[in-house]
């Protein structure tokens, strides 16, 4: 049975790996999405992360496709009580460019609830910061959703340390709900935007961290080791070039060494390293097949030694 971890100061207890929902309705059709979701729950996973904007970037899409497929799966599987649903507002803008305007938050939440076919969003994220709206107004809008029973807990995504602190300071001053979860970009390659002030703030204030891009767009799987490998993925291959520059090859070499020592895959090791970092409750990773889900879930049982963690730290520094 999977050991669940409390997510910051929320009442959510989650498995130490979160399933990313950005592939549903983009890389994956309905049947493939259902297969991945079934495998995730069967393997002990609990939290599914999506957003209203997923996957507006795909030709013919307008946003909401991922939520719609997850909602269809929830109805077909009857597994609503086995999972926690996290979604986001703020990237799929309103008709006048609204991001976190109170009316847009309210309307977006209703649309997400309808697509998901649920009565409450377990964890609702501000998908990005919006300095055009006073932070207390944003939090008051979220507070109304919590009071109405439509949202369980709040999170912030892509916030800098100063803005996360000022938001929670405003919450304290005005008696409003806090951001108890942070979703930053963080992995062995991309570390400096989280490590330091932001990580320290999260640890000090018990803010649960669920990093996205935990596998650096797939680079940390070891699948892309040269430009010749870029063709292995039509959607991700073109994003690999920056990772091959600088410390990328050094990180892969360090992962290879740990893989030899443990028998684990590079993806499992990368996620286990992430899960071991201060403040991190569970990394987020997406999968395109049940086999990938099984591999990723294997990271939950992998404990790296202090020497292995140090070697990876040094390689990715």
Describe the residue ranges of each PLM region.
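Beta/alpha (TIM)-barrel catalytic core signal, keyed to glycine-rich beta->alpha loops juxtaposed to Asp/Glu
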Residues: 129, 133-317
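Active-site groove signature of glycoside hydrolases
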Residues: 113-132
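N-terminal binding-site loop/beta-alpha segment at the start of enzyme catalytic domains
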Residues: 1-81
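Acidic (Asp/Glu)-rich catalytic clusters
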Residues: 41-42, 73-84, 113-117, 146, ...
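A short acidic, helix-capping loop that chelates divalent metal ions and anchors anionic groups
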Residues: 54-59, 92-97, 295
């Amino acid at each position: 049975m999977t050991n669940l971890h409390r997510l910051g100061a929320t009442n959510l207890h989650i498995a130490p790996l979160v399933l990313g929902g950005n592939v549903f309705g983009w890389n994956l059709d309905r049947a493939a999405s259902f297969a991945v979701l079934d495998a995730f729950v069967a393997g002990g996973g609990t939290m599914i992360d999506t957003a209203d904007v997923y996957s507006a970037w795909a030709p013919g899409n307008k946003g909401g496709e991922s939520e719609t497929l997850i909602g269809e799966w929830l109805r077909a599987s009857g597994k609503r009580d086995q999972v926690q649903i996290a979604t986001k507002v703020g990237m799929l803008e309103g008709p006048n460019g609204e991001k976190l305007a109170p009316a847009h938050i309210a309307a977006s939440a209703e649309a997400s609830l309808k697509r998901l076919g649920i009565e409450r969003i377990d964890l609702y994220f501000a998908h990005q910061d919006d300095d055009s709206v006073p932070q207390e107004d944003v939090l008051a809008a979220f507070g109304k959703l919590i009071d109405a029973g439509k949202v369980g807990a709040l999170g912030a995504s892509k916030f800098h340390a100063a803005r996360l602190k000022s938001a929670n300071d405003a919450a304290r001053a005005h008696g409003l709900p806090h951001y108890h979860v942070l979703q930053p970009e963080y992995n062995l390659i991309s570390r400096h935007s989280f490590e330091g002030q932001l990580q320290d703030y999260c640890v000090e204030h018990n803010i649960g961290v669920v990093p996205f891009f935990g596998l650096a767009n797939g680079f940390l799987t070891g699948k892309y080791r040269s430009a010749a490998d870029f063709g292995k993925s039509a959607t991700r291959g073109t994003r690999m070039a920056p990772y091959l520059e600088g410390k990328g090859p050094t990180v892969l070499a360090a992962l290879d060494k740990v893989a030899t020592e443990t028998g684990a895959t590079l993806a499992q090791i990368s996620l286990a390293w992430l899960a071991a970092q201060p403040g991190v409750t569970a990394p987020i990773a997406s999968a395109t097949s049940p086999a990938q889900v099984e591999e990723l879930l294997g990271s939950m049982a992998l404990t790296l030694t202090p020497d292995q963690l140090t070697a990876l730290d040094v390689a990715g520094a």
